Amino acid sequence: MSNEFKIKNIKAIGLEVPITNLSTPPESLPYYQELKNIVFGSYKSVIVEVEEEGGIKGFGECMTRIAPSALIDIIYEVMKPIAVGKDPLEHDLIWEEIYGVMRQRGHSKGFYIEALSGLDIAIWDLAGKLLHKPVSKLLGGKFHEKLECYASSIRFKKPEDVVTEVQKVLQEGFGKVKLKIGRGVDEDIAAVKAVRDNFGDMIKIMVDANSGYNVNSALQVGKKLEKYEVLWFEEPIPPDNIPGYAELSRTLDIPIAAGESEFTRYGFRELIERGGIKVLQPNVGRAGGFTELKKILSISSAYGIPYAPHTGSSSAVTMAAEMQLAANSPDFLIYEYMNNAWSHEQPNPLNYDLLNEKISPPVNGYLTVGDADGIGISLNKDTIKKYLI
């Protein structure tokens, strides 16, 4: 084992930004009222800081939708004792040891893997900084200097309001946009039809139901969407209904996209082999970090399935990490650029103020991937102090 570098310390930093003016989720979504109060009441993040003996620090992010304290406790009580003293260049060994400790004890998904994901991203970021290389090079090199983006997401609105939002997206240089659906067949189709009628082929459309349908209603919606040349139908049903995904994939002519709710190569193997999805959407801060995403993307590549990273409402740390991973993937399809926060009146400051190095917005629908060490970031101390839990 190499003793050239050693991890000296690990910190878990919980951040929360209350949302004061929030749009209510549509009543068609399962437990919509609970979603509003628990999930959508604030922007949350857990940032992981890994420090090497020489004082160099790497940063990662755990996908955090609820209970940041759970992630923080897992990192401190389970993962820190294992990782401290290890060589950050031996990320695979660290990952497997941490995963293996709890795998047989019922913790192969959920908070445990989200915590491991954030830690793993931070270790890779640290490794890149120690070696003075971007993570994309450590992963094997850049296939893409620029990443095509789609605008995400136009949320639940009346058709005329959706048209207004799409006009803004076009003016910002995007050629593709994702619409949130899940309100019911008639309302969903009316919104998609309004966009297609007003803009024709000027804009490409994806739709995302966030698991708002069952198989029967998803089939109804999907059949009606086919005539509007929708690029993909995302998370039409709950993520644990693998047979349902298989039925939708067999029956509909629209590619089924999923993956933001899945964990590790084992979960994605089932989603791909049994679920038959056509677009893979893992989140690096949930599915297992860089170490595990390399394995996941090897499986999807063998099946010829394109990769469209999920960023969602995570912070700029996840954005930076996903850019490095996407640049390295020969199967990269398109990048989710969140130009619409959960609250239009209150953009997420963890996207714009958290980093000292700002991520430049897309130009004509493309992001440029940088070559800075690691994932190319450091944290703004004032923002951390302001939103620290």
Task: Label the model's feature ranges.
Residues 9, 51-130, 345-346:
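Metal- or metallocofactor-binding catalytic centers and their adjacent structured scaffolds
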Residues 345-389:
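C-terminal extensions of enzymes
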Residues 58, 149-152, 177-179, 205-209, ...:
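Hydrophobic faces of well-ordered beta-strands that scaffold small-molecule active sites
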Residues 2-54, 59, 63, 352-353:
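Structured beta-strand/loop patches that form or line metal/cofactor-binding pockets in enzymes
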Residues 7, 55, 79, 119, ...:
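Conserved, mostly hydrophobic/aromatic
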Residues 51, 116, 120-156:
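Glycine-rich, aromatic-flanked loop segments that form ligand/cofactor-binding clefts
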Residues 26-29, 223, 229, 240-257, ...:
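Shared catalytic-loop signature of beta/alpha-barrel
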Residues 140-252:
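Metal-dependent enolase-superfamily TIM-barrel catalytic cores that perform enediolate-based chemistry
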